[in-house]
Design a protein with these regions (language model features):
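Active-site mouth of glycoside hydrolases
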Residues: 2-221
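Residue-level preference for short coil/turn positions at secondary-structure junctions
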Residues: 17, 59, 150, 184, ...
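A generic structural motif
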Residues: 35-36, 373, 381
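Structured core elements
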Residues: 64, 80-81, 237-238, 270, ...
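Aromatic- and carboxylate-lined catalytic core of secreted/periplasmic carbohydrate-active enzymes
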Residues: 244-245, 254-378, 387-409
């Protein structure tokens, strides 16, 4: 399988007024991310290269990583710690950061971008938050921004990390401004607790795009709706959610979040596998997991769409549920987007409800998110639709593509 990412030209950035990323030639860039948070210290260079080669071949375009080990006393696989004195952010160990660059440079050769969390601020799983104060952390911020400013495949800085970190907001703001001053073209966001970081920093000049974070389908929908109502001219994507390999998490759950993000955010999505982000002994076997293949299918489908022109529908304007009081049916909103200029509609439907398009349909098709295979529309009545049964894994989720005769704007 060939590397699917070479068509993009670095650097990748957000142009003014765009709700998506684009490359140096202004080509829309689909953020298809993978969380390998511990890549820089749990993986050897050779293992990291194997991982990156696989993700590039599968069509992933962004790797989300943490720059520092989980705890200040940890080292990377070559025995190097990021700081020569534990907990002293002034005592940077250049060898550690040089080895990070080797991974970043290898990813660049493969056409991969990196979204990097410079210092993870979770107070319940890491201890770096204890040192996030004063001039020391601002000097560290300047060091990191300058150390990697020559790399044009860093797509974003992820500030925060699994925590609202309310007591640290003043320092977070100062730190983020330093990154923006030194790296003005690298986008920035905030990774909060189970919510959206825009609630705290969305109005700041350094905040460029939203990173939703949710483990609940209804909440995920509401996060996208909230962000788009506040910041209609900024991108948003689901940056973290359920992980493949976690107990009770089936692939249809992962697909629901993926397509919700792609459809409602108009920007991209980030997938993750438990054994890969943690770096367990099973990480290599997990590279070819079922859901990672489904993400590859999603990319192939989206590459055929003029997706950057799609607009999400949060009000149920384009698809109307007709009947849901029946087994395995729902009346909840259908993730839907529409390209008004091309009269195209895309939706993700995962139950047996009856529904209709509010606009006259010229033609359409169902797309199996497992295989990418297509099926003809199955009309129950003159204008009534229902999913065509079970997909290739025996689940009930499908993509609907419609070409409309006209769109009543």
């Amino acid at each position: 399988m060939k590397n699917q990412n070479q068509k993009y030209v670095f650097p990748i950035s957000i142009k003014p007024g765009q709700t998506y990323f684009s490359d140096a030639n202004h080509k829309p860039f689909l953020w298809l991310g993978d969380t390998c948070w511990r890549l820089f210290w749990e993986y050897t260079l050779e293992e990291a290269q194997t991982y990156l080669e696989n993700r590039a071949k599968q069509g992933f375009s962004v790797i989300q990583v943490q720059l520092l080990p989980q705890y200040f006393h940890q080292c990377n696989r070559r025995g190097h710690k990021p700081f020569l004195v534990e907990g002293n952010l002034h005592s940077v160990n250049p060898i550690y950061f040089d080895e990070v660059e080797k991974v970043l440079q290898y990813g660049k050769k493969l056409g991969l971008s990196f979204a990097i969390a410079p210092i993870w601020l979770s107070s319940w799983e890491q201890d770096w938050y204890q040192y996030f104060h004063g001039q020391t952390v601002l000097d560290y911020s300047a060091f990191v921004a300058q150390r990697y400013c020559h790399l044009d495949n860093i797509i974003a800085w992820i500030h925060g990390g699994d925590d609202d970190a309310l007591s640290l907001h003043s320092t977070i703001h100062q730190s983020a401004n330093i990154y923006k001053q030194i790296n003005p073209d690298i986008a920035a966001t905030y990774h909060a607790g189970i919510s959206g970081g825009w609630e705290f920093f969305g109005d700041q000049n350094w905040f460029d795009f939203g990173m939703a974070y949710s483990y609940d389908k209804d909440d995920c929908f509401k996060q996208f709706q909230d962000f788009k109502s506040r910041y209609p001219d900024k991108p948003i994507l689901l940056g973290e959610s359920h992980y493949e390999g976690n107990e009770g998490i089936s692939t249809d759950i992962l697909r629901h979040y993926a397509y919700s993000s792609l459809i409602l955010g108009n920007c991209g999505h980030t997938y993750g596998h438990k054994d890969i982000w943690i770096g367990t002994m099973f990480w290599a076997q997990s590279l070819c997991s079922a859901a990672s293949h489904h993400m590859e299918v999603a990319k192939d489908i989206w590459d055929q769409l003029d997706w950057s022109k799609m607009q999400p529908d949060f009000k149920g304007r384009w698809l109307q549920t007709l009947r849901s009081k029946m087994p395995h049916a729902s009346s909840k909103p259908i993730p839907t987007c529409i390209n008004i200029n091309r009269n195209e509609l895309v939706a993700y439907i995962s139950d047996f409800r009856w529904f209709r398009s509010t606009q006259p349909v010229h033609k359409g098709k169902w797309i199996d998110p497992i295989s990418g295979r297509e099926k003809q529309l199955n009309w129950l009545e003159e204008d009534t639709l229902q999913i065509p049964g079970y997909n290739a894994t025996g689940h009930t989720d499908w993509l609907l593509y419609l070409e409309l005769k006209e769109v009543n704007k």
